[in-house]
Amino acid sequence: MKIGVLGVQGDVREHVEALHKLGVETLIVKLPEQLDMVDGLILPGGESTTMIRILKEMDMDEKLVERINNGLPVFATCAGVILLAKRIKNYSQEKLGVLDITVERNAYGRQVESFETFVEIPAVGKDPFRAIFIRAPRIVETGKNVEILATYDYDPVLVKEGNILACTFHPELTDDLRLHRYFLEMVK
């Protein structure tokens, strides 16, 4: 099994390190043809407008949508969730539009208002998961086929729709590998 981490911008290294701790072969994906070399893909946190601009400049956006629509398992964190969303509230931004959610960018505030909390994620075990929110998006609406796996303050923060796992916080910034392990089970 080989897992790609989209390497255009953001928390690439942190996701690669988490995967290496789990003994997984990784590939930092920087070219469209590399999307065919991976069994699953992580879209890291970063800056979503920069990420979509780079994807378009590299002609990778359409290939990525095609691979996701054909079943490529994807794990998106923070800005990666914005990239995948079908709808963005009160903001005009290009996106991939493959996940049936509406998101609100930077909904928890600016960088200085970033915070940590614990969330319950029954799908990965009974112990609370340390969630780090940094300029995080808020999922304000989910489609009927979107499964909510975790919430914070009544808002979904971890959702799954088919082959897509989307997390508004940063699990890669913790030592807790349960969400990465959960994603690997989706890939198998």
Swiss-Prot record:
Pathway: Cofactor biosynthesis; pyridoxal 5'-phosphate biosynthesis
Chain sites annotated for binding L-glutamine: 46-48, 105, 134-135
This protein's record includes keyword Signal: no
Key words, A-Z: Glutamine amidotransferase, Hydrolase, Lyase, Pyridoxal phosphate
GO CC annotations on file: cytosol; glutaminase complex
UniProt GO BP: glutamine catabolic process; pyridoxal phosphate biosynthetic process; pyridoxine metabolic process
Active site: 78, 170, 172
Disulfide bond residue pairs: none
UniProt cross-references to InterPro entries, sorted A to Z: Class_I_gatase-like (IPR029062), PdxT/SNO (IPR002161), PdxT/SNO_CS (IPR021196)
Superkingdom of source: Bacteria
GO molecular function: glutaminase activity; pyridoxal 5'-phosphate synthase (glutamine hydrolysing) activity
EC number: 4.3.3.6, 3.5.1.2
Alphabetized PROSITE patterns for the sequence: PDXT_SNO_1 (PS01236), PDXT_SNO_2 (PS51130)
Catalytic activity: aldehydo-D-ribose 5-phosphate + D-glyceraldehyde 3-phosphate + L-glutamine = pyridoxal 5'-phosphate + L-glutamate + phosphate + 3 H2O + H(+); L-glutamine + H2O = L-glutamate + NH4(+)
Similarity section: Belongs to the glutaminase PdxT/SNO family.
HAMAP family assigned: PdxT
Complexes and interactors: In the presence of PdxS, forms a dodecamer of heterodimers. Only shows activity in the heterodimer.
Function: Catalyzes the hydrolysis of glutamine to glutamate and ammonia as part of the biosynthesis of pyridoxal 5'-phosphate. The resulting ammonia molecule is channeled to the active site of PdxS.
Protein name: Pyridoxal 5'-phosphate synthase subunit PdxT
Lineage: Bacteria, Thermotogati, Thermotogota, Thermotogae, Thermotogales
Gene: pdxT
